[in-house]
Amino acid sequence: MLDSKLIKKICDFIYVKPRSIQEIAMHIQKNWRTADSYVDKIIKEQGNLSVRTFREGSRGALKIVYWNNVEKIHSNDFQERLFKKIEIAKDKKDFSPFDIYQYVDANKRRAFLEQQSEYTITAKQDLISAMRQTEKQLLIFSGNLSWVNAVQDKKKIIDIFEELANRNISIKVLCQVNLESIKNIEKLLELNHKLHKNNIEIRHCEQPFRAFAVDNTFVRFKESRNIESSSHHETKTYIFYEISDEEWIEWIQKVFWNLFRTSISAENRIKDIESIEKIK
């Protein structure tokens, strides 16, 4: 059973130097498959380990696990300056995703502009297909988690979350946990109870991004341009930035884990909010 003591034993072993799954298996006296599943669980839950597979697809494939230093966020001056801005940003108005986008190789990025109402996902965005590409982990930066109420072509996004969670995809969310967002948060966390699984974890954090990262495949940011139409249903203009550069994806993941590990769980914060008289 993977408990905190065994997690520490594995992490301490890998911290010294990169290890193969076979070495880890011998160290903890488990078989290769069990060691591999333990490493995968630690990666999903804590983000402090990473894996590289050499000669993938061949009989001689070698899986190496190494320490992912989430403290060392930046690998260049651009990233260092950006992270300093992110650390002090509390709202989406405080930081533009374009400040990241501009540094990414033109062949590994794309952006498009669309007008939409808050809860309607367009075919061009195709959020459903994007989410379904997830094989292991979906990391989400959100504000009030309003997109759990969104719909794409009559298909509810909350149903896609359920689909992913049922496939044992790890879903980690950073969002503001307050009176305005509690219903959205509880709606998403309810899937854990419904499925009798704990694949969804939400933590409170005030941060500037509205984005999600699909495994190591791509990151998509959403930025509001605050342009409204005169129609009854409020329509805004948004810019979507998509990044597929491996180095920048890894950096954004490290930003996520740096914020996530120091943030309080949504469940605990909701309990504290509800402890205030007359709020329940």
How would you name each of these model-derived features?
Residues 7-14:
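Hydrophobic residues on short alpha-helical segments
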Residues 1-6, 20, 51-78:
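Short, cationic-aromatic polyanion-contact patches
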Residues 200-248, 256:
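HKD (HxKxxxxD) catalytic microenvironment of the phospholipase D
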Residues 174-215:
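HKD-type phospholipase D/PLD-like phosphodiesterase module
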Residues 30-41:
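Short amphipathic alpha-helical interaction segments
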Residues 26, 44:
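Alpha-helical residues within the helix-turn-helix
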Residues 83-173:
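PLD-like (HKD) phosphodiesterase/transphosphatidyltransferase domain
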Residues 14-23:
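Short capping segments at the starts of secondary-structure elements
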